[in-house]
Amino acid sequence: MAKWGQGDPRWIVEEREDGTNVNNWHWTERDATIWSKGKLRELLVGIAMENEAGRCEISELKQVEGEASCNSRKGKLIFFYEWNIKLAWKGTVKESGAKHKGLIEIPSLSEENEINDTEVNVSKKKGDGEILKDLMRTTGTAKVREALGEYLKALKTEFTTGMILPTKAVATQELTLQRKLNENKLQASPVALGVRIPTVALHLTELFDTTVEQLYSIFTVKELVQKFSKSPAVLEAERGGKFQMFDGNISGEYVELVTNRKIIMKWRCRNWPEEHYATVELNFVPAPGQTELQLDCKGVPVCKEENMKFCWQKQHFEEIKGLLELTAQNA
């Protein structure tokens, strides 16, 4: 029998500060299912394609069934994933202005098949519009496969951060270097750094009984923001300008403003991880007697997805509609 401390190093649990999987020998597994669903939604929803005949866009992730995991053994990473994905698409024929909808089905995305061999089926609801279906079958299929490739790349890099740990000697060197860096940071001016966390994307649309100009002003005029939010607001509606709403619970910065057409913002809630911002894009689309507001948001923490939906659907959309009704009554 080996003496204490002289056994096979593969089975010795060294005194590591993190206390996990020394020398990367032991089998560890991490469930990537929830993270993957959010990442697939982020990468697939919003994909757009256009040619001389029309324009199409993937509007919704209708179904994502399956699972994904990553395993670490002897310093190697092994990936397992199997997904059945259904997406909704919509499009407009340029010549006639006719609108059509359809589905995209990916019956088996798994490690057994190469991305270029992954089956992507496109269908369309009854009626004309085959020209849009052809656009989805060609350009659309290629873009979907490209997004699936980005998902696998992120699964193997972004998701696996920290699964392959350094050995004791390397870890000691890195720890010493990190301590020095931390000491330097304390002496230097603070720098706002973002954090990498699992995120999802959201796509919401809402119709408002008002003009594009009026709806745009509700998001850019301080007095109107204070009316629908029923709280003080800080608003600098210009590129690089800051904003703060709902008693400081929401804050951020304007990235781009195109009058009566588009607003892009860096956006965060107070209870999100420090220095983490989502990107929120609002597009104002005129419709007969109404305005359609299209909201696309990327970078929402997975654990805050439902809160984000509530914030926009209840605290923004419903309150703005209430303000518009009150304005119409007092007119």
From Swiss-Prot:
Organism: Mus musculus (Mouse)
SUPFAM superfamilies in UniProt: Activator of Hsp90 ATPase, Aha1, Bet v1-like
Name under which the protein is recorded: Activator of 90 kDa heat shock protein ATPase homolog 2
Keywords from the UniProt entry: Chaperone, Stress response
rRNA processing keyword on record: no
MF annotations from Gene Ontology: ATPase activator activity; protein-folding chaperone binding
Gene expressing this chain: Ahsa2
Gene3D superfamilies: 3.30.530.20, Activator of Hsp90 ATPase Aha1, N-terminal domain
UniProt-listed InterPro entries: Aha1, AHSA1-like_N, ASHA1/2-like_C, START-like_dom_sf
Function (record text): Co-chaperone that stimulates HSP90 ATPase activity.
The family this protein is said to belong to: Belongs to the AHA1 family.
